[in-house]
Amino acid sequence: TPSQDFMRF
């Protein structure tokens, strides 16, 4: 999800 996409970093 786009909301969690930043968490992949």
UniProtKB/Swiss-Prot annotation:
Gene Ontology CC terms: extracellular region
Residues found modified as Phenylalanine amide: 9
A biological process term (GO) from this entry: neuropeptide signaling pathway
Cellular location(s): Secreted
Protein family: Belongs to the FARP (FMRFamide related peptide) family.
Purpose: Able to induce fluid secretion from the isolated salivary gland of Calliphora.
Protein name: CalliFMRFamide-2
UniProt source species: Calliphora vomitoria (Blue bottle fly)
